[in-house]
Amino acid sequence: MSKILNTIWQYVRAFVLIYACLYAGIFIASLLPVTIPGSIIGMLILFVLLALQILPAQWVNPGCYLLIRYMALLFVPIGVGVMQYFDLLRAQFGPVVVSCAISTLVVFLVVSWSSQLVHGERKVVGQKGSKE
């Protein structure tokens, strides 16, 4: 019985922490003069808490594993919502495709530039440069 209660406690604690970060993000987003989704701010809060090890990762693991396991099911309402606006999407198909293609190209360029910046050639300390 105590093992069942312990498992239930772990799931409850995980979801309370995840939702606390979500609602903190929503509250902060309502105070900001710019429009940033509260869920994004909430994820950043959760990330900072985990990265600084203020919040132990094992406290949110059960809830995260459960959400990831059923992630495909969570996208069904979004798909239904998109299908409600199918006529609008069909009318704007060209601009949507061009926008996606350009944004993908921009992401490729930014990632390649930043990767080159981070992982580019560096001099090895103590090694003389070769003259060719």
Curated annotation (Swiss-Prot):
The keyword Membrane applies. GO terms for cellular component: plasma membrane. Pfam families: LrgA. The chain crosses the membrane at residues 8-28, 31-51, 63-83, 93-113. It is found in: Cell inner membrane. InterPro entries: LrgA/CidA, Uncharacterised_UPF0299. The keyword Cell membrane applies. Keywords: Cell inner membrane, Cell membrane, Membrane, Transmembrane, Transmembrane helix. It comes from the Bacteria. It is a multi-pass membrane protein. Belongs to the UPF0299 family. This is UPF0299 membrane protein YohJ. It comes from Escherichia fergusonii (strain ATCC 35469 / DSM 13698 / CCUG 18766 / IAM 14443 / JCM 21226 / LMG 7866 / NBRC 102419 / NCTC 12128 / CDC 0568-73). The gene is yohJ.
